[in-house]
Amino acid sequence: MFGIITVTGEDHTGIIAAVTTALAEQDVNIVDVSQTLMDKWFTMILRVEFNEKATPISTLQGYMDSVGKREGLVIRIQSEALFNAVNEI
């Protein structure tokens, strides 16, 4: 399954390391990534691939919520199909 992950929050050292390490621990492969800084605000969007039977998206969201809480970030995960449907014009 492909998913889209958004990460937002106040910039600080270690955000990318914390997020990507957590994803690797859940056997999630990063297919594409884009990140930017706007003043003190960090934003990252990742396209990822993972086995939803082995790691349901709800389980992955819960795991990433704990990372977000620890790092002061908002991390949201949704299926790529849902992301595309919602963002289609």
Regions found by a protein language model. Name each.
Residues 1-89:
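A conserved regulatory-domain signal marking ACT and ACT-like small-molecule sensing domains
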